[in-house]
A protein has these predicted regions:
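Catalytic tyrosine of NAD(P)H-dependent dehydrogenase/reductases that use a Tyr as the general acid/base
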Residues: 115
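Hydrophobic alpha-helical segments within soluble ligand-binding/sensing domains
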Residues: 118-121
Length: 182
């Protein structure tokens, strides 16, 4: 007699952003935008999961759980910790997707681990998991002329300009391709 056991190796893809329509299409919500784009392409449905303080979508084909924490950007670690505990996963099983105003607009940088580099969402995950040993994908949102005029806080909450908005689908497609290969 044979017993077959399926080992479930799920990855959790966490897109950073702030809940609420007033933050739609802001630089800080690029993680949410990336997951929304991916979910649309793969015909996934979002579900509210209050126990995770998040909205999630499952991609069974690729063994992924997409997560948009509803805690606000700087407290994303609360949701991540709850999800990892629930599914009995490790920090290395997540992929954090966040904006980075120090990277050229649309540039994508992947790291297996590392410091938060000033990103409060990454700091929150590091604090709640007790490690910075988790993968992250930083997406460039740099616009130095605008940032120098309005400051960092207002910059990350600013909307994309027309030229950036036009390039956005290409950037989101590239992120989606990365997620599938990840």
């Amino acid at each position: 007699m044979f017993i077959y056991v399926k080992i479930y190796l799920m990855k959790v893809i966490v897109g950073f952003g702030n809940p609420g329509s007033k933050y739609n299409f802001t630089r800080h919500n690029l993680g949410f935008l990336a997951l929304d784009f991916y979910a649309k392409i793969h015909q996934l449905n979002w579900q509210n999961k209050p126990k995770f303080n998040a909205i999630v979508a499952k991609d069974d084909e690729h063994d992924l759980l997409l997560v948009k924490a509803q805690t606000y950007y700087n407290e994303v670690g609360l949701s991540v910790r709850t999800i990892l505990d629930f599914y009995k996963l490790k920090a290395q099983d997540i992929l954090a997707i966040c904006d980075d105003f120090n990277l050229e607009f649309g540039k994508i940088r992947f790291r297996e681990r590392g410091s938060a580099g000033g990103n409060n969402g990454l700091k929150s995950i590091t604090t709640h998991l007790g490690t910075d040993d988790f993968p992250r994908l930083r997406i460039g949102t740099a616009n130095d002329s605008l940032r120098s005029k309005i400051g960092d806080t207002d910059f990350v909450l600013s909307r994309f300009n027309d030229a950036e908005y036009e390039k956005l689908p290409e950037v989101l497609r590239e992120i989606g391709d990365f997620i599938v290969k990840y």
